[in-house]
Regions:
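Alpha-helical transmembrane bundle of multi-pass membrane proteins
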Residues: 1-240, 257-511
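TPR/TPR-like alpha-solenoid helical repeat scaffolds
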Residues: 247-259
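Short intracellular "coupling" helices and adjacent cytoplasmic loop segments at the cytosolic face
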Residues: 238-248
Length: 511
């Protein structure tokens, strides 16, 4: 058998809830799944807060006068260096999530996050701010990889898309709140108004650190990988019910057969044989999520609106409206994402994003030729349209897809690599948007629309639909039976019982 990785947790049974008796049959507890998901998604809340907090700050003259950036490239670097930190943080997940566990990795990420927030809030120079952004980015990057990984591994297959959409909804709720929070502080008669929106993040980060270390249970799939089968059985009973707990453990154990016999998986395994194709799909879908324009609009929304003719105050208010649209649109995948499937939603979203980007380009072109025309104010509508389609598709779809397609022995490393791909493309977008916008103006959004065309054909012809499949069946779908185990080897009775249980859980949840 494979040697267990050292665990920081005791190996005794996890204490069951007060209203249960060990060994007693228990029904699926979907509400417990939702509770755990909502709590660990505090990491996504902090992710969303940081996506929105800087867009208004970097457009404020008082902040610019204090920090004195040399040019547009310097402003872009303050924004984009955060993404380098995020990429580094995401890459650490492959090691820490496998050794410490998913939930304790979130605690470690929170400590790093708090250090970065303190550095930023205390900054008086552009260099200090940049270092703080880098450190905080490491924590956010770890959140961005570990949260989807954990919630994917605790969710029944029938609602896994919905669980991923809840992650998105909480992220978007944070973006909405931070926009109005920063907008309110924008009117303070102080050059240091921006410090509080940054410093206040420490509170939820501290709550997440303590909760993940003391209350959140380990992922059952991680427990099986550590050969802690009794603990895994207890967690699965609490999450999915007694009827399928033993069967799911068997599936997970079978998915680790080859890893038990052979050496521990390495980063090189991500680029060998059929796994290379899965790695390509996961990293490309995350890369395209960013390169199609979401943060080219989001990070510089106030600047975009002012170019369209809005005043600084109106531009900030319109930017706050982006947060409202993001939050409202995030409810669509929560309710319907598992009904149509990943590919369908991604294609619908890409088409809508394409036309929204064309609309932005045309109105910016009109604003350049006809400054002061009241029609220029319509530029507000197209970013709203863009984010409606983006949030109902790519915002949750790319994260869900990338987190679920890898075999269990490579899942943590695969998720880390895919998340790092997203942050690298995010860095490219954040760093190049200001100078490209200065050079070609509205042409930037035509360029982004062309990336949407590429994304559409990639989704249509390269992706394989994964809706309704258990994580242990993914190896069969992608032809990785000899890598992830023989979990989908034709035992139809077991798979049918699993599907029956999770379908009944979904029916119960919908009532």
């Amino acid at each position: 058998m494979r040697a267990s990785t050292v665990s920081l947790k005791q190996t005794k049974l996890i204490r069951p809830p007060r209203d249960t008796v060990p060994g007693q049959d228990r029904p699926p507890n979907i509400h417990y799944v939702y509770t755990l998901t909502s709590f660990v998604c505090l990491g996504s809340f902090l992710f969303g807060w940081n996506q929105g907090v800087m867009s208004m700050i970097i457009a404020d003259k008082r902040w610019l006068d204090l920090m004195k950036p040399a040019n547009d490239w310097a402003v872009g670097f303050v924004v984009s260096i955060y993404n380098i930190g995020c990429a580094a943080g995401a890459m650490t997940i492959g090691f820490f999530a496998d050794s410490l566990g998913r939930e304790r990795t979130l605690s470690l990420a929170s400590i790093i996050f708090i250090a970065g927030a303190l550095l930023q809030a205390a900054s008086y120079t552009i260099t200090q701010m940049t270092v703080g952004r880098l450190v905080l980015g490491v924590g956010v990057g770890a959140y961005s990889a570990a949260v989807p990984l954990y919630i994917t591994e605790i969710a029944p297959a029938a609602i896994r898309g919905r669980i991923g959409a809840i992650n998105l909804m909480i992220l978007c709720f944070a973006e909405m709140v931070v926009f109005f929070f920063v907008y309110g502080f924008f009117f303070m008669n102080s050059n240091d108004w921006w410090r509080l929106p940054i410093a206040i993040q420490i509170v939820p980060a501290l709550i997440l650190a303590v909760g993940c270390w003391t209350w959140v249970p380990p992922s059952p799939r991680w427990l099986v990988a550590q050969e802690r089968y009794d603990c895994a059985h207890e967690v699965l009973c609490r999450l999915h019910g007694s009827d399928v707990a033993e069967l799911e453990i068997k599936e997970i154990r079978e998915s680790l057969v080859v890893e038990d016999v052979s050496a521990q998986s390495t980063w090189a395994d991500m680029f060998k044989g059929p796994v290379l194709w899965v790695t390509f799909l996961g990293t490309t879908i995350q890369f395209l999520q960013q390169i199609t324009g979401t943060n080219a609009i989001f990070y510089y929304a106030p600047t975009l609106f002012m170019k369209g003719g809005l005043t600084a105050e109106a531009a900030n208010l319109a930017t706050a409206g982006v947060g409202v649209v993001l939050f409202l649109a995030a409810w669509i995948p929560v309710m319907y994402f598992d009904r149509l499937g990943r590919k369908t939603w991604l294609q619908i979203g890409t088409v809508g994003m394409f036309f929204a980007l064309i609309g932005i380009a045309m109105l910016l072109r009109h604003a350049e030729r006809h400054p002061g025309d009241a029609a220029n104010n319509a530029i507000v509508l197209f970013p709203y349209l863009f984010y409606t389609f983006f949030n109902m598709s790519w915002s949750s779809g790319s994260w869900t897809y990338a987190a679920e397609i890898f075999p269990i022995s490579l899942r943590a490393k695969g998720n880390a690599l895919c998340t790092a791909s997203l942050w690298v493309s995010n860095f490219i977008v954040a760093q190049t948007t200001p100078p490209i916008a200065s050079a070609i103006g509205w042409g930037l959004y035509i360029l982004l629309a062309m990336f949407c065309v590429i994304a559409f054909f990639f989704v249509r012809y390269a992706l394989i639909e994964t809706r309704g499949r258990t994580l242990e069946e993914m190896s069969q779908i992608f032809g990785l039976e000899d890598i992830g185990g023989k979990q989908a080897d034709g035992n139809s009775e077991r798979n049918e019982l699993l599907r029956s249980s999770i379908d009944s859980a979904r029916d119960e949840d919908n009532e």
